[in-house]
């Protein structure tokens, strides 16, 4: 547990932005990143506490307006389009996987979300 606590502390020190909201299916969706995108995380938790996480380097494709996060452990990647809405929320479009509407949140949301998922959830990826 102390290793995880250090990880959460490190995340809090690294992250500079966090967005939280819901997918179309009602799942919790949390996106967080540091200034230059070298560390990004996406966490999706469903109503049954099953979760999928992507933690690793993020790249932004300006031409297509997409962000891709490649998970450091699984090497799986998640790509989503980013659209800014009139009410300052963001819509993250993941194609066949659906979309999520998120708003700016405190960094604690990202850290607490990951902590909750690790301690209570079932990893799905």
Question: Where do the language-model regions lie?
Answer:
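Tryptophan-anchored aromatic micro-motifs
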Residues: 1-29, 112-125
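Generic detection of short hydrophobic beta-strand segments and adjacent strand-loop junctions
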Residues: 6, 21, 56, 67, ...
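N-terminal glycine/threonine-rich, aromatic-flanked beta-hairpin/loop signature
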Residues: 10-66
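A structural detector for short beta-strand units
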Residues: 25-31, 54-58, 76-81, 97-103
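An anionic, turn-rich surface loop/hairpin at beta-sheet edges
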Residues: 65-84
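Short, exposed beta-strand-loop hairpins at the edges of beta-sheets
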Residues: 90-95
């Amino acid at each position: 547990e102390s290793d995880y606590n250090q990880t959460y502390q490190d995340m809090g020190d690294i992250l500079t932005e966090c967005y939280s909201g819901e997918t179309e299916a009602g799942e919790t969706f949390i996106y967080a990143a540091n200034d230059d995108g070298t560390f990004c995380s996406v966490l999706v938790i469903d109503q049954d506490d099953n979760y999928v996480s992507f933690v690793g380097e993020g790249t932004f494709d300006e031409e297509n307006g997409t962000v891709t996060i490649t998970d450091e452990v699984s090497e799986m990647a998640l790509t989503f389009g980013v659209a800014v809405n009139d009410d300052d929320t963001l819509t993250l479009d993941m194609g066949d996987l659906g979309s999520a509407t998120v708003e700016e949140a405190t960094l604690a949301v990202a850290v607490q979300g990951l902590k909750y998922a690790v301690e209570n959830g079932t990893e799905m990826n």
